[in-house]
């Protein structure tokens, strides 16, 4: 509690970005930071710190991957203005073809302002905010579960790694914190793995469970802001970064 009796909560999230970092160490690690920060401020919490826990191999390629991953983590955190307060790094030959990149973030939020990733009322609106949708990260979630063949990184694999825009993320962060403080929304969800498709399904699923209802949602793909012409199926599963789905009243 604060001096005036206001109750606060700490938000903590941690996730891995292993395969993307192996394929493209700079963007893979940077987007890992971006994703974990969005997990924090979609709850209405302001991120106050980042930590990273790294495991890399000992061969020449692994050292190059490590150096670029650290640069990506540092760049994204510095641009957004959230300090990296610690972590650890170890090397071992067992990580030569499978580095481990775990990123953790901490945030703080007033208890009364916590936002959950759900839709609770009929006729609520799903509002898309943030970056335009592109072909970045198509099949990224599936790629993260695959095994590399002969340790080769193909152009197709590289296209599965998302591109980062930390300056846009900073704008999203501030907007979401303001939304939280003013209690303007019913729910909010980051568009992470699986993109718009998974984000909308998760929002509806949680809403159904909380309200014991059979609610669903309609998505108008022709209204989604896109960078260029895209197939509707790709719009649904794109993992372009810095995008959110907000649940609000009209």
Where are the model-predicted features located?
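Glycine/proline-enriched, intrinsically flexible loops and inter-domain linkers
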Residues: 1-250
